[in-house]
Amino acid sequence: MAKRDYYEILGVSKNATKEEIKKAYRKLSKKYHPDINKEPDAAEKFKEIKEAYEVLSDDQKRAHYDQFGHADPNQGFGGFRSDDFDFGGFSGFSGFDDIFSTFFGGGRRRDPNAPRAGADLQYTMTLTFEEAVFGKETDIEIPREETCNTCHGTGAKPGTKKETCSYCHGTGQISTEQSTPFGRIVNRRTCPYCGGTGQYIKERCTTCGGTGRVKRRKKIHVKIPAGIDDGQQLRVAGQGEPGINGGPPGDLYIVFHVEPHEFFERDGDDIYCEIPLTFAQAALGDEIEVPTLHGKVRLKIPAGTQTGTKFRLKGKGVPNVRGYGYGDQHVIVRVVTPTKLTEKQKQLLREFDQLGGSSMHQGPHGRFFEKVKKAFKGES
C-alpha cells in the first residue's frame, strides 16, 4: 500500500512553517493517542502522524522528502554514469573511461549550480483575415513562472541564506568506496539531501515555498508583421521563463491561427475570389467593380468571356511577411444561369437561339457537338 503524503497526514500546506507543523502535530497526536482514542486504527494513525512530524520538523529530512518523496534515491541502478566512479586500481588504462562513455552516455557531471537558460513558452493567437494581412500591435498576457520578488530567487526567507549541506559537506556528491578483485572503486552519487547543490534551505520563503519562483501573468506588447499566415509562428526573444542560477531567459513563440474570409481565399501571398457574370456581360463584355484587400478596382471583361476564365490583378494580394513586395489577386468569373424567367425573357432567348443559327457549332464547342452527332449516327 502506498504511503500517504506527509503534508496531507498533518493537514498542512507544503509552504507551512515549522510552528504550523508543530501545532498540527500536537493536535493530531493528542486526538489519536492510543491511550485516549480507542478506535481500532488509532494506533496506526498515531504512528503515521509521528513519522510525518519527524520528517517535516527536520530541515534536511524535509528538503529530502520534498525532492524525492517516499522514494529512496539510493535504490536502483538509475543515475549510473562513467564519471560516478573513480577506478583507483586502473590508473594504467587511460581508455577505460572512454569505454564507459560509449556504453553509458559519458559526459561530465552537470553542475546543478551552473547557469541554465529558462524554458521556452508557446502561445496561440487567433487573428481575423484582415489582421493577418495588414498586421497589428496588441498586448497579450502570458502565464509563466517568474523570479520571486520576496527572496529574489534564492528560495530562502528574507534575512536568511542557504546553508552548506552537512551530508555532502557542500560538494553535492556522496561517495561510497568498494573493494573489488580489480581494485578500489569509489562510487559518487548526487547527494539526495541537497539535490547536488551542496546547499539546503533552512528557512523557506513563505511567498514561493522555497522554489524561488512564483506563477504570474506577464503583459507583453507584440507587433505582428503584415502578411503572417495561418500556422506560422513569431519568436519574441527573452520573453520565456527566467533563467536558472543567473542563466538567460527563454523565448516566447506565438503560433497564429487565421480565421477564414467569407469572400477571399489565400494561397501564400496570392488572393483568389470568384465574381458572378450574367449571360449578357459574358457575351457582350463589360467593365465591373471588383473588391480587393486594398479597395475596389475596375476590371474590363472582354466579350465572349467563358465561365472559369481567370484574371490577374497584379500587386493586389498579400504583403510578403519578409518584405518582398505583394502577391497578386486572381479573379475567377462564373457565368450565372438564370433560374426564374418571365415569358418575355424566354421568348427573347428562343429568338436569340434562332438568330444565332449555326454560331454555336463553330469554334471548339461546335466541333465537340459535331463529334457527338456523328458518333450517334455511326459515322467515322
Curated annotation (Swiss-Prot):
Where is this protein found? Cytoplasm
* Ranges occupied by CXXCXGXG motif repeats: 148-155, 165-172, 191-198, 205-212
Q: Which UniProt keywords apply?
A: Chaperone, Cytoplasm, DNA replication, Metal-binding, Repeat, Stress response, Zinc, Zinc-finger
Q: Which residues bind Zn(2+) 1?
A: 148, 151, 205, 208
What is the protein named? Chaperone protein DnaJ
Enumerate the cofactors the protein uses: Zn(2+)
Got a GO cellular component term for this one? cytoplasm
GO term, biological process aspect, one = chaperone cofactor-dependent protein refolding
Pfam families for this protein: DnaJ, DnaJ_C, DnaJ_CXXCXGXG
ZnF locations on chain (CR-type) = 135-217
Q: What does this protein do?
A: Participates actively in the response to hyperosmotic and heat shock by preventing the aggregation of stress-denatured proteins and by disaggregating proteins, also in an autonomous, DnaK-independent fashion. Unfolded proteins bind initially to DnaJ; upon interaction with the DnaJ-bound protein, DnaK hydrolyzes its bound ATP, resulting in the formation of a stable complex. GrpE releases ADP from DnaK; ATP binding to DnaK triggers the release of the substrate protein, thus completing the reaction cycle.
Q: Name one GO molecular function term.
A: zinc ion binding
Q: Which family does the record assign?
A: Belongs to the DnaJ family.
The source's superkingdom equals Bacteria
Q: Which gene encodes it?
A: dnaJ
Description of its domains = The J domain is necessary and sufficient to stimulate DnaK ATPase activity. Zinc center 1 plays an important role in the autonomous, DnaK-independent chaperone activity of DnaJ. Zinc center 2 is essential for interaction with DnaK and for DnaJ activity.
Listed under subunit, the entry gives: Homodimer.
SMART domains (alphabetical): DnaJ
InterPro entries, alphabetically? DnaJ, DnaJ_C, DnaJ_domain, DnaJ_domain_CS, HSP40/DnaJ_pept-bd, HSP_DnaJ_Cys-rich_dom, HSP_DnaJ_Cys-rich_dom_sf, J_dom_sf
Q: Where is the J domain?
A: 5-69
Annotated residues that bind Zn(2+) 2 are located at 165, 168, 191, 194
Q: Output the CDD domains linked to this UniProt entry.
A: DnaJ, DnaJ_C, DnaJ_zf
Q: How is the cofactor bound?
A: Binds 2 Zn(2+) ions per monomer.
